[in-house]
Structures are given as C-alpha cells and as structure tokens.
C-alpha cells in the first residue's frame, strides 16, 4: 500500500462526485459560473489522457428551486417530482458547459439494483465504458424519479464509490462544502485537527465522521467514510476536498487542503469488487476467532467456525461476515440459504450430508466467492509491503 498521493492528471480513470450545494443556490438556482469552471478542469484532465466520470447531485435541489417548493424536508413523491424536472435541467446544463470544450456529455441514471444485481451491474459498466471509449463524459446520478425510500443509495457519495469500483477507476474525488476529514467537527471543537492522509479506515476514523447534511443535499461525512471503505477496498484512492472555489480540481492540483484516503495495495478481480461493494448484504454470518484467522489466510469459510446466522438470504446472495469484535471482516456469496446454514453451523463439513440429507458443499462460503473488507486487510498488506521493501 502506497501512502503517496499522485497528481490528479497522473491517474488513468477518475470519478468526480459533486454535491448539490455546489451546483445549486436556493434563491438563484444553477450556479452557471461554477459549472463552467469545473468543466474547464475536467477538459484539462481529459486532455492529459484521463478518463473522467461525473456523479452529479443537484437534480432534486434544482427541481425544487424551479418548482418553487417550500424549504424543509420533502415527501417522497415531492422529491420524485422535483427530480423529474431537475434531471432535464441538470443534463442540459452539463451538456452546454462541456460542449464549449467540444466534449459530449452522456446522462446515466442508476438505481440501487443496477449495481446490486450482477447482470444489470455488467450492463451499466459496459455502457459507461463505451461512453468513455468514444470520448464522452458520463454524467451519472441516482434515478430519484423511481427510487423508493427502502431501495435506494440515499446519497451520491456511496453511488460514486460504486461507480468507481464498477468501472475500475483509480481515483475518486468527493467535492462538497467540506474540505476534508477532521478529528472532530471543527465548528464545534476549536482543537479539531485536520487529517491530510488516512492510511486505513479504522473504527477511530469512523467515529470521527458525523454531522448533518445541508437541506439541499443528503450526504455528510458519514456517507463519505462509507464511500471511502468501498473505494479503497477495491484499490481506488479517494480525496475529500472543498468545491466552494471556482476550478476546484485545479485548486487540488495546486495544493489546496484536502484529505487523501490511500487505496489498498491489492487489486481484486471484477467479481470480487462487485461482492465487496454490495451496499445491502442479505444477511450476516458471525464467525469465531479460528474461522476469522483462516479467512485472513485466504481459506474458505467452513460451517465449523460459524457461531450465528442472521437474516433470510438465499443461496448465492451476498452476505456480510462478522468477526469476533463485532465488525465486518469480509463479504461473500452464500453457499447455502439461511435455513440450511442455521442447521449446519458448528458442524464439520463431513456431517453436512447427514444433517441436510444431500451431499452439499464443504464450505459455507468458498474462497473464490469471498473478499476481505475493512482496515485489517490494509494492515496485513502493509506488513507484507514492509517485508518486501
């Protein structure tokens, strides 16, 4: 794992997430000057050979401004109506600003199932890759006109992380009104320290995340840390930076303060990237210390090391594996459904046939269907890097 931050222009594929408050003003609507300025930055990156994708918030915020909806929380149907109006205006604005640099914009609206269901995930990835291949800039947003409260990303930070892992990006940049991660909310604690480099997203780092989002947006530092966990586990670095200034990407290149989250040093297969990035695991499997150690050694998860099964999942569903400290250590595809899994926990693999009445798999989750997650993975690989240094 390398903690060295490279210039933006040296990255091959970059995902830029833009918060609603940067694009939309409650009174005046779209911030056209700001949009034109960041399109200058994007054009410069593209000219240097980088593939650039934009995850743009702002559809609901822009739509509610156009419709003159009152301040305060919106009902689901009001949000969907605002999104329907705002998506048209937002796409047009991006297209016009990028066209000044002879760049074509392509709009992609995603729902949670587009990244959680394998076939739709592959289709979405193919579409984005084709847009990049022909030189277009994908402008991506959650399809808020059809997303429901129960089935949605809920914020564009995590959506951006999923897009980054889905398309093999090596850098994710989260632009908002926050310039990075502090040890505590700086407006509440004058002694809060700014963190320029985050090597691992540990429980201590997670505890630092907090604070409510603005009325125009749904994200906060909590969702940015969640995004960092998704991105860095897939080998993608992440930057949290303020976008309040014009040309914010150029500002980052020129040394403006921002927080850098180092990627894990081990690229994983596309299939395992998809498994690791699942936002809604169908269930949980809690394991003992011996099983947890075996997982870190690259072994499959056997029934003997399982202590508890939670949830109602089917065979092939993505599930979270919880270690002895109560934190997620891995994710994988279930080799058994929840009912069968509960019957065989704590038993040896050679006892499965007697219990279930048929010859089943020896592993609860096979190592080919399993990927380690969390800071412990990075610590492990960092030690390996030290050995080989």
UniProtKB/Swiss-Prot annotation:
One Pfam short name: PUA
Record-level Gene Ontology MF annotations: ATP binding; glutamate 5-kinase activity; RNA binding
Disulfide bond positions: none
Gene3D superfamilies: Acetylglutamate kinase-like, PUA domain
Catalysed reaction, written as an equation: L-glutamate + ATP = L-glutamyl 5-phosphate + ADP
Record-listed substrate binding positions: 57, 144, 156
Broadest EC class assigned to this enzyme: transferase
Sequence similarity: Belongs to the glutamate 5-kinase family.
Function summary: Catalyzes the transfer of a phosphate group to glutamate to form L-glutamate 5-phosphate.
Name of the protein: Glutamate 5-kinase
Species annotation: Agrobacterium fabrum (strain C58 / ATCC 33970) (Agrobacterium tumefaciens (strain C58))
């Amino acid at each position: 794992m390398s903690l060295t931050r490279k210039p933006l222009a040296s990255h091959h594929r970059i995902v830029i997430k833009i918060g609603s408050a940067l694009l939309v003003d409650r009174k005046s609507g779209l911030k056209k000057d700001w949009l034109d300025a960041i399109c200058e930055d994007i054009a410069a990156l593209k000219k240097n050979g980088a593939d650039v994708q934009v995850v743009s918030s702002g559809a609901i915020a822009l739509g509610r401004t156009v419709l003159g909806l009152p301040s305060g929380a919106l009902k689901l149907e009001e949000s969907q109506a605002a999104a329907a109006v705002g998506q048209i205006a937002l796409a047009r604005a991006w297209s016009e600003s990028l066209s000044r640099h002879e760049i074509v914009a392509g709009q992609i609206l995603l729902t949670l199932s587009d990244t959680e269901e394998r076939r739709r995930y592959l289709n979405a990835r193919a579409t984005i890759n084709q847009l990049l291949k022909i030189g277009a800039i994908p402008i991506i947003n959650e399809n808020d006109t059809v997303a429901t409260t129960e089935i949605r990303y809920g914020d564009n930070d995590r959506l951006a992380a999923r897009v980054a892992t889905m398309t093999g990006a090596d850098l994710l940049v989260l632009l908002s009104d926050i310039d990075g991660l502090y040890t505590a909310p700086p407006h509440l604690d004058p002694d809060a320290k700014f963190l320029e480099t985050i090597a691992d997203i540990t429980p201590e780092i997670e505890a630092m995340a907090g604070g409510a989002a603005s009325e125009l947006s749904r994200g906060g530092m909590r969702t940015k840390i969640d995004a960092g966990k998704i991105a860095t586990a897939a080998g993608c670095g992440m930057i949290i930076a303020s976008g309040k200034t014009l040309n914010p990407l150029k500002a980052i290149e020129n040394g403006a303060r921002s927080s850098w989250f180092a990627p894990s040093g081990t690229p994983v297969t596309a299939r395992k990237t998809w498994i690791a990035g699942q936002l809604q695991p169908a269930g949980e499997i809690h394991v003992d210390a011996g099983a947890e150690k075996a997982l870190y050694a690259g072994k499959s998860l056997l029934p003997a090391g399982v202590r508890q099964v939670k949830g109602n999942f089917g065979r092939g569903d993505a599930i979270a594996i919880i270690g002895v400290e109560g934190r997620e250590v891995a994710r994988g595809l279930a080799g058994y459904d929840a009912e069968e899994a509960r019957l065989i926990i704590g038993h040896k693999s050679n006892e499965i046939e007697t219990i279930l009445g048929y010859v089943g798999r020896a592993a609860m989750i096979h190592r080919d269907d399993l990927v380690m997650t969390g800071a412990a993975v990075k610590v492990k690989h960092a030690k390996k890097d030290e050995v080989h240094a």
